[in-house]
Amino acid sequence: MPLLGVTRKERDPATKLTANIGNALREQNDRLSRAEEIERRLAEGQAVIELDASSIEPSFVQDRMRGDIDGLLTSIREQGQQVPILVRPHPSQPGRYQVAFGHRRLRAVSELGLPVRAVVRELTDEQVVVAQGQENNEREDLTFIEKARFAHRLNRQFSREIVIAAMSIDKSNLSKMLLLVDALPSELTDAIGAAPGVGRPSWQQLAELIEKVSSPADVAKYAMSEEVQALPSAERFKAVIASLKPSRVARGLPEVMATPDGTRIAQVTQSKAKLEITIDRKATPDFATFVLDHVPALYQAYHAENQRKRGE
């Protein structure tokens, strides 16, 4: 039934935008609720205790690349650690523990010098990675490259069935992730970081560019440079891509010359064999004549300069 006499199709763009934002927020909240439900189920029947952060080791399979946790630090500083982490008794170090999920919370609480609220539960290696993967998938806070590298690490130690269950993906997408990680030097992805917002197509483009260079190590070295490391992670990715793309001049593609006010005056095409300058007579007819008249004088000036340099 129309709302206030206006059908859905007749609603203004602002109304549609508000509705879309509302739907997105509800979907995000639903995912967070499901992630918390996973945590509750895994911790079901277990008491929350406080542990010394120094007694807890990270998971044996890293899922995250080190990133900014300022927002989480502020939240825990002001409100405390609201959600406990899940740990298991360390399989080889008595008296110590290993994280199943909650690495960022552990890091934040450690930096604040607080005890860690945790649930301790006996878990097999397989249960740890499946719990770790499912919680990450519901929160959707891992970037593409973090997910791909996590899958790659899991694939070294577990069957494809366990990896697929942990990642909640099919065999085809898993294969694509594994091939992509294999194609990228680990030093390069470490230097770039998590790259929020950079999806699989962009990482695939980087892998294809890397395949064409003679020294991938030099690309990683550039990514580790002080200049690039000063940028946010996603900007580091863009900088690396830009450094690998051939310039328009190198590819023989035309460049446009224009005046400060934007008037197009010429198109320049360069290659190893020749340089072509194409002037639009319709846009600047007098300039075309001016250039033709001055080419001989320009060449004479060039020749004289060469003679002078040889005489020095």
From Swiss-Prot:
One of its GO terms (molecular function) is DNA binding. One of its GO terms (cellular component) is chromosome. It holds the Pfam family ParBc. GO terms for biological process: chromosome segregation; DNA replication. Coiled coil: none annotated. NCBIfam families: parB_part (TIGR00180), partition_RepB (TIGR03454). This protein is coded by a hairy root Ri plasmid, it is probably involved in its replication. This is Putative replication protein B. It comes from Rhizobium rhizogenes (Agrobacterium rhizogenes). The lineage of its organism: Bacteria, Pseudomonadati, Pseudomonadota, Alphaproteobacteria, Hyphomicrobiales.
